[in-house]
Each structure stands twice: as structure tokens, then as C-alpha cells.
Amino acid sequence: VEEGEGAPVILLHGFPETNYAWRYQIPVLSRHYRVIAPDLRGYGETDKPASGYDKRNMARDIRELMRVLGLQKVVLVGHDRGARVATRFAKDYPELVDRLVVMDNVPTRIVARDLNASIARAYWFFLFHLVPDLPEALIAGREHIWLRHFFSDWTYNPSTISDEAFDTYVRAYQAPGAVRGAMADYRANAEDVAQDMA
């Protein structure tokens, strides 16, 4: 998605979203900025490759997008998983970042360092998503149940997620390889930690 003219702003969505998550911000921001809201690798309408979900590689995806669009420097805004990509991008390509905004995110290395039983219970899905092939098998055909959990239990005010928005995300995750793409994002966590600690 791309709208508007002016200084470029790239919006990176979180899990379990797609660029559709920015549908309310894009019209407002595009009054003054050139707004670009891609789907992250493995999410939404992107390809669903078998590998390359570490945040350094996903940051390279954003760098390539900038190259294709002829962008020299951007304001980079990331939410949740998108914040992890944005942070990695800012570390690897600081000369390309005018401003960085990260929302709803704890740094990868902190999550890994502070993981305990209490946090594991609260963030059970982080660990569930790491198991090879099982989440995909259990979620297939039940995407609406899986997504309902996140949009009900993990949302401050679940009534803000309209039926239209929910159905949009369900359709996105029913696409071939979509659940695997999201799981691969989480499965790259150990590699992300190693990159952050280097």
C-alpha cells in the first residue's frame, strides 16, 4: 500500500496482522507524507518462502523496497513484530533512518533473557509457534478460532475489531502458506537473539 506525497514513512505491522492494520493511519498520514505500508515477509500478500524470517533478512527486504522506490531516508514505524524488523533495520542501516518509532515491543534479547514460567504462561503462543509443523496442522481450517483468541484476549477493547477487519485477517491466514509464514517469523527468534547480541 502506498499513498500520499512528501517525506517517506514506512509502516510495519505486527502479528497477527497485515498492512491492513494501518488502514486508519494511512489516510491521515498521507495528507503530509508519502506512506508505504508493506506486508512483512510471510504475511498478507507477500511470498511465503521456507526461510529468511530472521529480522536481519526482513530488514534487507525493507532496504530493497526502499531501493526499488528510490528512497534515501525514511521515518520507520513498527508495531509488535514490525517493531523488531524496524529496530534491526535501524541497527543495520542507521544512515537510512530519519526517525524510528517502535510500539508494543520488548527487545528480543530481553524476552530471551527474562523468559520464566510466569512469562511462558502469559506468552504461551511464542513457544507454541516455535514447534515445527504442529501449529500449522492444528490451525488449518480453524484460522478464525486461532485469530479470535488474539483479537479477543490480547486486545484492550475487542469491540474495536470490526467483523470486516476480523474477516480480512481470517482470509489472509487462509491463504496457502500464510500460517507457516507467521510461524517462521517466531521460529527465527533464536537467530534474532544471536544477531542482537553480536
Enumerate the language-model features and the residues they cover.
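A short loop-to-beta-strand scaffold at the N-terminal edge of the catalytic core in hydrolase folds
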Residues: 1-3
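Short beta-strand element of the alpha/beta-hydrolase
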Residues: 6-13
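Flexible "cap/lid" subdomain of the alpha/beta-hydrolase fold that forms the substrate-access gate
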Residues: 8, 22, 36, 43-77, ...
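Conserved residues at beta->alpha junctions
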Residues: 13-16, 173
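The serine-hydrolase catalytic nucleophile loop
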Residues: 15-26
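Alpha-helical and His/Cys-centered functional microenvironments
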Residues: 17, 29, 83
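Active-site machinery of serine-nucleophile hydrolases
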Residues: 29-39
